[in-house]
Amino acid sequence: REGGSMEALDHVLRQGYHLALLRYAVEDDEHYTHYCARRGLKMEPIMDFEYSLLTNRDGPLARKEIRDLSELDKYMEILHDDFQLPGEEGGDGVRWHVNPERRIHVYERCSQFSILQRLPTAYMWASPMPRRALEQYHLVLKKCPAQRQQMRDVLVYPDKGRLRPEEQAFVDLLHKEAASTVK
C-alpha cells in the first residue's frame, strides 16, 4: 500500500504490517533513526540517491539543462503529496519546490506518469527508475545540477529476530532492483 513515511511507520507499529519502505531526505536520517529505535523497529538501507528531473522524452525539458530552479517556473510540476517533514506544517518542512502556482498534486504513481506522457511541459522530481518503465511511459530521467537533495530509501520492520523466508526474498529483490535502476 502506498503512503507517506509516517503513515507507513504507523502501519507497521499499529496495524500489523510486517514491512514498510520509507523514503526521506538524508538530512532527516537522525529523526527517523531515533523514531524507529525508540519503537523497536529495525532499519535496513536500500538505496541512497539524488532526485532527478523526470519529464516527457519529447518535451522541452528533455533537451534543457536546468542550472537554477527558477528556470522551471514556466513548467508544470507534478507533485507527490508527501512533501513535508513529519510533524511540520507549511514553510519549514517544505523543500525545493519551484512555483506554487504551477503544481498538480497527484498521489498515485501511474497517474503521475500518465500526466507526464500527455503534458510535455510537465516534470516531477523522481527517484532512480527501471529503464523499462522510462521506455513504457516515453519518459526521460535527467540529472539536474540545480537540485542536489540527497534521499534515502530504507526498509523498516519490527526488530523481532529473523525475517520470514518470503519477507527476506522480498528484501533481496528490493536490493537487486535498486542496483539495476537508471540513476
Predicted stretch roles:
Residues R1-T33:
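Central regulatory/effector-binding core of bacterial HTH transcription factors
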Residues Y35-E77:
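Flexible hinge/capping segments at coil-to-helix
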Residues A37-D48, S127-P128, Q136-Q150, D159:
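Short beta-strand->loop
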Residues L13-H18, R23, D82-L141:
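Hydrophobic hinge/microswitch elements
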Residues M6-L13, M43, L69, F113:
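Short hydrophobic/charged patches on amphipathic alpha-helices used for structural packing
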Residues V140-V182:
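A late-sequence structural motif
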Residues A25-E30, A62-R63, D68-V98, R164, ...:
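Secondary-structure junction motif
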